């Protein structure tokens, strides 16, 4: 059962900045409650040196189950997410409760290694396909299968965010924000 209507974006040291910040921005423009969650602490440093202050840390969330959880890619950020057991527990709880699970770039490996992509279509950054256990690997840049959204990398961070937002809200809201930000239809 979901205990929090928020979207949790998980930040681990070494996260890919565009893949993390773009979904935060777009989903907030869609008037969703987005919480920046630090996996490795309250201050988290990205793969390219950007340092961000988190709203909450993973330890503060206890057994919360959000409406959605987003895993940005980047290295070593993805490996840090994958190595943190409470991340897997949170992702599994969210999926079991019918929440949205989104992962971009290398991060689909985290949900793939948890077995959550079995029988689903999924994509990821080239070279990480072996971790999409049981998934139908496709070369599309953004893939939505049920309540799961996967994406290939930084260049599609906005499309990824709009796909997540469409599942959480609706396509009309996503299209409105997309147009207001001057994205082409």
Task: Kindly label every feature range from the protein language model.
Residues 1-97, 110-113, 118-119, 131-139, ...:
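Extended, subdomain-level signal for the structured scaffold at the beginning of enzyme domains
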Residues 36-38, 101-105, 120-125:
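Short, hydrophobic beta-strand segments that form beta-sheet elements in well-ordered domains
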Residues 143-148:
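Beta-strand-turn-beta hairpins that frame and shape the catalytic cleft
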């Amino acid at each position: 059962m979901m205990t929090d209507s928020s979207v949790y974006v998980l930040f681990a040291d070494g996260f890919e900045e565009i893949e993390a910040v773009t979904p935060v921005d777009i989903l907030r423009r869609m008037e969703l409650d987005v919480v920046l969650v630090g996996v490795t602490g309250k201050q988290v440093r990205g793969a390219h040196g950007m340092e961000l202050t988190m709203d909450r840390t993973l330890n503060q969330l206890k057994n919360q189950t959000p409406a959605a959880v987003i895993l940005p890619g980047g290295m070593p950020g993805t490996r840090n997410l994958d190595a943190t057991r409470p991340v897997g527990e949170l992702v599994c709880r969210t999926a079991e409760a019918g929440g949205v699970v989104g992962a971009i770039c290398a991060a689909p490996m985290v949900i793939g290694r948890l077995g959550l992509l079995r029988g689903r279509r999924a994509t990821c950054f080239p070279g990480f396909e072996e971790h999409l256990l049981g998934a139908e690997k496709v070369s599309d840049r953004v893939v939505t299968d049920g309540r799961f959204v996967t994406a290939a990398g930084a260049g599609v961070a906005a499309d990824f965010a709009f796909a997540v937002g469409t599942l959480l809200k609706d396509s009309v809201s996503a299209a409105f924000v997309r147009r207001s930000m001057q994205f082409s239809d």
